[in-house]
A protein has these predicted regions:
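Extracytosolic ligand-binding ectodomains
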Residues: 1-185
Length: 185
């Protein structure tokens, strides 16, 4: 594909019509919009009002967008996320039992996985019989996480040399305004 336009805005902006009109004038086939759901909802609404009716693509910040955009605005759009609803019914049921509501977005499963990762590292240091708070203990925690494989709610993952997780991502689309897993990639 070819990038036909690149636009930006400042933090706190709520009017995106100038940027969207510029994009529209370039005749795009799709728009990549890696923003958070509150802004994306405003952007999709304003895109519709200026006649920019193409699929939008986004990242994990879109998780929860269905509360901020209509089914028509979300039609044919895709986003990637760390978790797809239904991937772990046990986690979802436990979350609902604890908090009385469905999990709000992918941050809950990610938070669980972050805590599980720390516990994984601490357990390795404890199993080695090291004294908490020592440099050796801290190094054992770091080494275990860096070399381990974690079975998390968002999937199985390891960490690369930059300490970034290596794992699959969920590719989702919207069906009747609700996110639906298309594939794991």
């Amino acid at each position: 594909g070819t990038i036909v336009d690149q636009e930006s805005y400042s933090e706190g902006d709520v009017d995106f019509k100038t940027q969207l009109t510029s994009i529209l004038g370039k005749g795009p086939e799709t728009v990549f919009c890696p923003n958070y759901y509150e802004e994306v909802g405003q952007i999709l609404s304003q895109a519709e009002s200026v006649g920019l009716n193409v699929p939008f693509l986004g990242g994990d910040g879109w998780d929860g967008l269905e509360g901020y955009a209509t089914a028509d605005q979300l039609k044919d759009s895709y986003f990637c996320a760390n978790y797809a609803k239904g991937s772990s019914p046990e986690f979802e049921d436990a979350y609902k039992a604890e908090y009385g509501e469905d999990y709000p977005n992918g941050f809950a499963p990610l938070g669980y996985d972050a805590a599980k990762t720390v516990v994984y590292g601490v357990q390795a240091a404890e199993d080695a019989g090291l004294e908490a708070g020592t440099d050796e203990y801290k190094q054992a925690v770091n080494d275990a996480i860096a070399s381990g494989t974690i079975e998390g709610i968002t999937g199985t993952f390891t960490f690369d040399e930059h300490h970034d997780p290596v794992k699959k991502t969920a590719i989702l689309t919207y069906v009747d305004g609700k996110p639906e897993l298309k594939e794991m990639f």
